[in-house]
Amino acid sequence: MIFKVFYQENADEVPVREKTKTLYIEAESERDVRRKLEGRPINIEYIQPLEGAHLEYEKKSPNFQVLEISS
């Protein structure tokens, strides 16, 4: 499944909506996403599963690139 992760680049700062970034990652669950991203200096705000029409819509975005991280 593909997940869209909303995050802040600096885990030490208070989240500011205007600085929120996104990435796409393939994983089996939200817990798997967090495990794959642990150790990175980011502050995860929200993890959204993408499927169906929503996934197809996101694929049309020029920023859609699935991050591949081995388990």
UniProtKB/Swiss-Prot annotation:
Coiled-coil intervals, chain numbering: none
Any one cellular-component term (Gene Ontology): DNA-directed RNA polymerase complex
The protein's enzyme class: transferase
Annotated keywords: DNA-directed RNA polymerase, Nucleotidyltransferase, Transcription, Transferase
Superkingdom of the organism of origin: Bacteria
Catalytic activity as recorded in UniProt: RNA(n) + a ribonucleoside 5'-triphosphate = RNA(n+1) + diphosphate
One GO-annotated biological process of the protein: DNA-templated transcription
Signal peptide span: none
GO terms, molecular function: DNA binding; DNA-directed RNA polymerase activity
EC number: 2.7.7.6
Keyword Transferase tagged: yes
Keyword Chloroplast in record: no
Xref: Pfam families: RpoY
Family designation: Belongs to the RNA polymerase subunit epsilon family.
Subunit details: Monomer. RNAP is composed of a core of 2 alpha, a beta and a beta' subunit. The core is associated with a delta subunit, and at least one of epsilon or omega. When a sigma factor is associated with the core the holoenzyme is formed, which can initiate transcription.
Known role: A non-essential component of RNA polymerase (RNAP). Has a similar structure to bacteriophage T7 protein Gp2 (AC P03704), which is known to bind to RNAP in the DNA binding-cleft. Unlike Gp2 however, this protein does not inhibit transcription initiation.
Descriptive protein name: DNA-directed RNA polymerase subunit epsilon
Species this chain originates from: Geobacillus stearothermophilus (strain DSM 13240 / CIP 106956 / 10)
